[in-house]
Each structure stands twice: as structure tokens, then as C-alpha cells.
Amino acid sequence: MVWVAAIALGLLAGFATRGRIDNLAHLHFRWPWLVVGVLAVRAAALLTPLRGVDGVQYVYAVGLAALVVWALWHVKRVAGIWLVATGSALNLVVIATNGGRMPVAPELAGSLVQRGHIGQYVVMASATHLNWLADWISLRGLVGWGPLEAYSPGDLIVALGIAAVTALAMRAGAAAETQAGIVGDPP
């Protein structure tokens, strides 16, 4: 949900700053399928019977590490992606510190409370580490509506990064066209 909201916020910011949606077509990522693969691994580790397999959390942690490296690789190519890299790195630190699992606040954990852990998630407790970077933020609590989902500070930084990449990409083509017009016009 937060990723969709981030894209929407980025689009609104892009339009508000006179960006154009067709400029998004000029975004060029190297190895975009890596991102799709990491998202597929995340979904499989949470939504399929694989979530009960011990060790699946390590596959997700390796995928997240690959995503951090991928985002860092794009820092000079894609404006704003450093925020995605930063948020993903924060999540990776928490997950690595907790044996491949992201702690979730008990009040936001749902069925996780009865099981203790599912896939790459574990219920936050005194035995989990870096709980202040774990999934303890509920946006429903902030805005008063929406699904009950838990987010980490890293997730929110990633969402801010997605919004920034979207807005800046919408503006990027407009800035290039303006510069070309100034250079190409006779004195």
C-alpha cells in the first residue's frame, strides 16, 4: 500500500512542479528484472507455503542485499534513488541482526503473534534487536484509515525515495528540453 501511495505522491509532486508523465519513459534502469526478482522472492517468502520453510528468510535477506547493491549502482544514474538504497540498507541491517527476519510490533503482527514467525517476519520481543528500526509504524494510526500494515523507518525512507525518483524523473526531461532550447536559440 505504501509503495502505491509513494508513486501517487511522486506523480502529484511531478505534476505540481510542471513535470511530464511521459518523461518517466526516459528512466533507464540496468537489470530491472533484479528488482522484480527480489519482489517475487519477498512475496513467495510471505504468501506461499515456502513461508513455513526454515531458511527462506535467508534467501530474502540475500535478495534484499542484492537490491541495496543495485540501488547503489544506480545512484549516479537515477536522481533520488539514494533514498531507496538508504531505506533498503536500514532494513537489511535489522534483518541481518535478527537472523534473517524483520521484527514486527505485536499489536501489528496479526496471525504472526500465534506462530512466532512467518517467512521473513518475527514478532518483536526483548530478544529481537534494533527494534526501533523494525516494523512498528502503522500509517493507519497516523491518518486514521486504511489497512493495518506495519512499516519500518527504512520502509518509509524507501517510499520517500520512490516518490522522489518519480517526481524528479518527471522533471528531468523538462529541464533537459529547456536547456536544449536555450543553447539552440540564436542570440
Locate the predicted segments by residue.
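Interfacial segments of alpha-helical transmembrane regions
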Residues: 66-98
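A cytosolic-side transmembrane-helix exit/cap motif
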Residues: 52, 78-84, 101-110
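Actinobacteria-biased recognition of intrinsically disordered, low-complexity terminal regions
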Residues: 1, 175-187
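Structural signal for the C-terminal ends of transmembrane alpha-helices
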Residues: 12-21, 69-78, 164-173
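Lipid-exposed faces of alpha-helical membrane segments in multi-pass integral membrane proteins
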Residues: 9, 37-44, 62-65, 86-93, ...
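Membrane-interface loop-to-helix entry segments
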Residues: 55-62, 150-160
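Extracytosolic (periplasmic/ER-lumenal) interhelical loops and adjacent juxtamembrane/interface segments
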Residues: 104-150
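Transmembrane alpha-helical insertion/packing segments
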Residues: 1-63
